[in-house]
């Protein structure tokens, strides 16, 4: 991808924002080197890794990168066999600790979704507990070795403490006895040796070695003779300490050197994970989504937003290109926000092709392009002595030399800066040439000739940016299929130009041109209304589809439970009948044996006894089956009341009755989070088992202890989250909690809005607010209960 388009579309600003989320210097460098990938496979893989990281962030929070530093320099030194500094070893030790924690963090639990790419990277991490432990035991901070690093160091430092204590006692004694000769009644240290501040005129009164003097020369720092031997002993111990520390550092450096290949691999993986999670964190704060990537030149962006415009000011637009038409001409006045649309499309393409989530709605599509070209703005300099037209044409010539059917070309005010007639003709010729090559093209223009060109040319479409004449400002909403209107007369009138001047101007323009402009305005108004209607219809359609899928899933789940219950009953019935059949076969065999023996009176008695046994077995089997059926059904309800608990045998689950029987004999019941209609005659009396009674009593006694101060609603849809939060708030209210926290995550804000709407109507809620810094920010809602 050419560097010019990255600069013109301000992709470097995006990289600076992403860099702010990276921790290590190496990961920050990876971000700054980021640019569109060369193959569609690479684009999809890097987008997928970003989406996986975002999913983990939403489910588990931030990865454990605490204490991580860039250790590239330390690794380079260790590879050469050099002795590492205390700081270098500490940072490698911290990196190994992060390796261990990351390995645990990325390990997938059975119930969690698979993250193919990140789990594959996790498998490359090798935990070096021995090296990590040896470093953490020996090093306390970036400039301190622990006493416990070795027995010898411990012994040396203990001796140092004793000697320092002795010399302090001695020097304090000397200070007290020579107060009249001293500048201050304090001792100090010069060159690791204890000295006292003696007035220059009394230096002969305090025998010893002069180590330093004050800037004025009035004070001499003298080491009293009585301290020389003690200072020498301390100096020797300090030299031994230094030698032992160097030995420990050398020993740890050798340990690192022996494992340097593994350490290097671990660091490279961690840097890449740091880079990936930086992309995901930026995408999360941006409200970005995973785009669908195609190779057909199709761009379909829904609710696309420019990522560098603040969220409270940016206006989203639907931008599409590549299916019905390959060239989009955005027409209208120069102040109409056309360039913003152009840059939004190009920048979103660059972001997606670089593995970043895009600021658009779910299921938006981008196309893989080998090159994106842009001629936007005036980039000529005074030194070059180029006019606006010459500057643009220089760029266009370069584009024409390289563009092909795998290119996306962006033109801002194509043909501007010269005679309008010649400029329009030249613009049409350039567009035709690039269209013949199969390029995808977006261009802005204010030439009327290009509006007509788009209207009569196949695969070329007009578009405009909606303009509010009342406020004299663009709304920045893109209207595809409607050419732009100049609005020159309306704007001039709003700014105070006299009507007679405007009317004179209209006379200069042909009637056909005025009618054409009026037609455009009418089209604009109709298009805006149609677009608004389409948006509302799409929202309703999506909601209907969502509810349809949700209830279809619930129905299938109920059907599955019912089928399982029936299957279990059939299996048990078959077992009873098989057992009875086996016993009956045995009895019949005995009867046949008796008949072969002859019919004596004794034999007849035995035969009748066996027949009796057979009848009893069959009756017993029938009774057991009937009893099982009755047990499964339970006792019928004599009376149905709203709010009562009942048993629904078809799903073998207790339900709550929500309505009286209707004219079909059906009632609505709630089973868990599901609401379903069933026949009233199918409901049975719900009986509590002893165990359930015990649990209820225990819950009543321990209610306060069991209601947590917060609940995590992330991962749920709005309906399930509201139901769960409602039940939780009831429990918290009964338990007497005054304040609770609902964790809904930041995400797109849909879940937060649903929770907020529910809280406004909840009977137990006194007030609620978003979390503050340290509480979870906008990812949580703090609720004050009545």
Curated annotation (Swiss-Prot):
* SUPFAM superfamilies hit by this protein: DNA repair protein MutS, domain III, P-loop containing nucleoside triphosphate hydrolases, SMR domain-like
**SMART domains, per database record:** MUTSac, MUTSd, SMR
One of the protein's GO biological processes: mismatch repair
Keywords noted in UniProt: ATP-binding, DNA-binding, Endonuclease, Hydrolase, Nuclease, Nucleotide-binding, RNA-binding, rRNA-binding
Summarize where ATP binds, as residue positions: 332-339
Instruction: Cite the InterPro entries for this sequence.
Output: DNA_mismatch_repair_MutS_C (IPR000432), DNA_mismatch_repair_MutS_core (IPR007696), DNA_mismatch_repair_MutS_sf (IPR036187), MSSS (IPR046893), MutS (IPR045076), MutS2 (IPR005747), P-loop_NTPase (IPR027417), Smr_dom (IPR002625)
The protein's matches in CDD domains, at most eight in alphabetical order, are given as: ABC_MutS2
- Please state the Enzyme Commission number of this protein: 3.1.-.-, 3.6.4.-
Q: Which GO terms describe its molecular function?
A: ATP binding; ATP hydrolysis activity; ATP-dependent DNA damage sensor activity; endonuclease activity; mismatched DNA binding; ribosomal large subunit binding; rRNA binding
Q: Boundaries of each Smr domain copy?
A: 711-786
Q: Which domain of life is it from?
A: Bacteria
This molecule's function is given as: Endonuclease that is involved in the suppression of homologous recombination and thus may have a key role in the control of bacterial genetic diversity.
- Entries under PANTHER family matching the protein: OS10G0509000 PROTEIN (PTHR48466:SF2), OS10G0509000 PROTEIN-RELATED (PTHR48466)
Q: How does it assemble?
A: Homodimer. Binds to stalled ribosomes, contacting rRNA.
Cite the NCBIfam families for this sequence: mutS2
Matching HAMAP family: MutS2
Can you tell me which family this protein belongs to?
Belongs to the DNA mismatch repair MutS family. MutS2 subfamily.
What name does the UniProt record give this protein? Endonuclease MutS2
The encoding gene is mutS2
């Amino acid at each position: 991808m050419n560097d010019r388009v990255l600069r013109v579309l301000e992709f470097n600003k995006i990289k600076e924002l992403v860099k702010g989320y990276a921790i290590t210097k190496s990961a920050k460098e990876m971000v700054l080197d980021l640019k569109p990938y060369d193959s569609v496979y690479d684009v999809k893989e890097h987008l997928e890794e970003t989406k996986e990281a975002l999913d983990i962030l939403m489910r588990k929070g931030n990865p454990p990168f605490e204490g991580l530093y860039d250790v590239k320099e330390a690794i380079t030194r260790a590879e050469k066999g050099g002795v590492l500094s205390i700081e270098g070893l500490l940072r490698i030790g911290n990196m190994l600790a992060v390796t261990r924690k990351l390995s645990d963090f990325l390990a997938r639990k059975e119930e969690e979704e698979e993250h193919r790419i990140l789990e594959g990277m996790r498998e490359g991490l090798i935990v070096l507990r021995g090296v990590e432990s040896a470093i953490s035991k020996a090093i306390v901070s970036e400039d301190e070795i622990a006493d416990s690093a070795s027995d010898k160091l411990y012994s040396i430092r203990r001796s140092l403490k004793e000697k320092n204590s002795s010399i302090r006692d001695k020097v304090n004694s000397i200070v007290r006895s020579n107060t009249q000769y001293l500048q201050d009644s304090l001792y100090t240290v010069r060159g690791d040796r204890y000295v006292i501040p003696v007035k220059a005129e009394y230096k002969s009164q305090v025998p010893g070695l002069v180590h330093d003097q004050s800037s004025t020369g009035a004070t001499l720092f003298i080491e009293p003779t009585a301290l020389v031997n003690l200072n020498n002993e301390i100096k020797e111990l300090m030299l031994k300490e230094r030698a032992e520390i160097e030995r420990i550092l050398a020993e740890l450096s050798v340990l690192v050197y022996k494992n340097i290949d593994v350490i290097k691999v671990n660091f490279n993986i961690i840097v890449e994970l740091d880079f990936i999670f930086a992309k995901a964190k930026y995408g999360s704060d941006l409200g970005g989504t995973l785009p669908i990537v195609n190779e057909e030149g199709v761009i379909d962006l829904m609710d696309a937003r420019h990522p560098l415009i603040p969220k409270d000011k940016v206006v989203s637009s639907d931008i599409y290109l590549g299916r019905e038409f390959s060239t989009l001409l955005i027409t209208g006045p120069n102040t109409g926000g056309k360039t913003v649309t152009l840059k939004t499309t190009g920048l979103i393409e660059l972001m997606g092709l670089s593995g970043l989530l895009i600021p658009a709605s779910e299921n938006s599509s981008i196309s893989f392009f080998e090159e994106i070209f842009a001629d936007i703005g005036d980039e000529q300099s005074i030194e070059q002595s180029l006019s606006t037209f010459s500057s643009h044409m220089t760029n266009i010539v370069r584009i024409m030399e390289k563009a092909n059917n795998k290119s996306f070309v962006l033109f801002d005010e194509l043909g501007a800066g010269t005679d309008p007639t010649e400029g329009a003709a030249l613009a049409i010729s350039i567009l035709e040439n690039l269209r013949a090559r199969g390029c995808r093209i977006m261009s802005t223009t204010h030439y009327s000739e290009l509006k007509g060109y788009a209207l009569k040319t196949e695969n070329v479409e007009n578009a405009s940016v909606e303009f509010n004449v009342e406020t004299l400002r663009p709304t920045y909403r893109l209207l595809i299929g409607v050419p732009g209107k100049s609005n020159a007369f309306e704007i001039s009138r709003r700014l105070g130009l006299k009507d007679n001047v405007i009317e004179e101007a209209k006379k200069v323009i042909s009637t056909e041109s005025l009618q054409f402009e009026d037609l455009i305005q009418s089209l604009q108004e109709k298009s805006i209304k149609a677009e608004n209607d389409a948006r509302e219809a799409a929202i309703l359609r999506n909601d209907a589809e969502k509810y349809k899928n949700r209830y279809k899933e619930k129905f299938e789940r109920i059907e599955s439970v019912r089928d399982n219950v029936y299957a279990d009953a059939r299996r048990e019935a078959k077992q009873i009948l098989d057992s009875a059949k086996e016993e009956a076969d045995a009895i019949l065999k005995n009867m046949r044996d008796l008949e072969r023996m002859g019919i004596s009176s004794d034999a007849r008695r035995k035969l009748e006894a066996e027949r009796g046994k057979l009848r009893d077995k069959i009756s017993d089997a029938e009774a057991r089956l009937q009893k099982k059926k009755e047990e499964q059904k339970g006792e019928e309800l004599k009376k149905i009341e709203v709010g009562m608990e009942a048993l629904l045998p078809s799903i073998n689950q207790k339900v709550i009755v929500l309505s009286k029987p209707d004219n079909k004999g059906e009632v609505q019941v709630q089973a868990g989070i599901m609401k379903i209609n069933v026949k009233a005659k199918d409901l049975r009396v719900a009986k509590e088992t002893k165990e359930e009674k015990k649990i209820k009593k225990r819950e009543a006694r321990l209610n306060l202890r069991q209601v947590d101060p917060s609940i995590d609603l992330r991962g749920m849809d709005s309906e399930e989250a509201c139901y769960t939060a409602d039940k939780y708030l009831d429990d918290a209210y009964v338990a007497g909690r005054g304040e609770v926290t609902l964790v809904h995550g930041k995400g797109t804000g849909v879940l937060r809005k649903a929770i907020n709407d529910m809280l406004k109507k909840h009977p137990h809620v006194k007030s609620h607010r978003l979390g503050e810094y340290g509480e979870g920010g906008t990812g949580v809602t703090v609720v004050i209960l009545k």
